[in-house]
Design a protein with these regions (language model features):
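Short acidic/histidine-rich motifs immediately flanking catalytic phosphotransfer sites
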Residues: 46-49
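Conserved mixed alpha/beta catalytic, RNA-binding, or beta-rich assembly cores of soluble enzyme
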Residues: 2-37, 56-174
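Short amphipathic alpha-helices and their capping/turn segments at secondary-structure boundaries
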Residues: 39-44
Length: 174
């Protein structure tokens, strides 16, 4: 089950079969209500195999170190039986690989192109992939997250800012 801070109008459930096993996959929107999300996670504990967090990222890997968003900690600590995860693992592996594969296969030639990530802090591995492909990378973290009129030019600049700011940013309220 994915508990999302997003709109409940997008709720959905589907039965799927993988490797001969039947699974129910469900998305439950909380309409921005963090308390409702906490209650839902507590109610589902022990009744589902896993709970995914939607609309909030708990963990931010930045250059070999992972930072925990303080506001997300309570969501991760509610359950006693059921694991609670966010999309960090998917982002760390899958998004980076997709960028590299799309370029390598010629589906979306990215190498050397201009790339803008509005919030690279939440897509660190994707930013790395663009840098590896020699893209003219711009990171809009300061503009889009904090309203500072400053575009971070290139992965090395973004990386230095992310490492310096991550401890403080993860203390800010969600």
């Amino acid at each position: 089950v994915s508990g999302s801070l997003g709109s409940s109008t997008r709720d959905h459930r589907v039965n799927i079969q993988l490797l001969g096993e039947e699974y129910l996959v469900e998305r439950i929107g909380m309409d921005g209500d963090l308390d409702k999300m906490k209650e839902t996670i507590a109610r589902l504990d022990g009744k589902v195999d896993a709970i995914g967090l939607g609309g909030i990222t708990a963990l931010f890997p930045v250059g070999g170190k992972t930072y925990l968003l303080r506001s997300a900690r309570p969501l991760l600590e509610i359950t006693k039986q059921t694991p609670v995860v966010d999309g960090t693992g998917w982002k760390k592996v899958l998004e980076r690989q997709v960028i590299l594969d799309l370029d390598r296969e010629g589906i979306v030639p990215v190498r050397g192109k201009k790339a803008l990530l509005t919030v690279a802090f939440d897509r660190y591995s994707m930013a790395q992939a663009f840098a590896e492909l020699g893209c003219d990378l711009r990171c809009g973290d300061l503009i889009f997250s904090f309203g500072f009129p400053c575009l971070l030019k290139g992965f090395p600049v973004f990386h230095r800012v992310a490492r310096a700011w991550a401890p403080a940013v993860c203390l800010l309220p969600f």
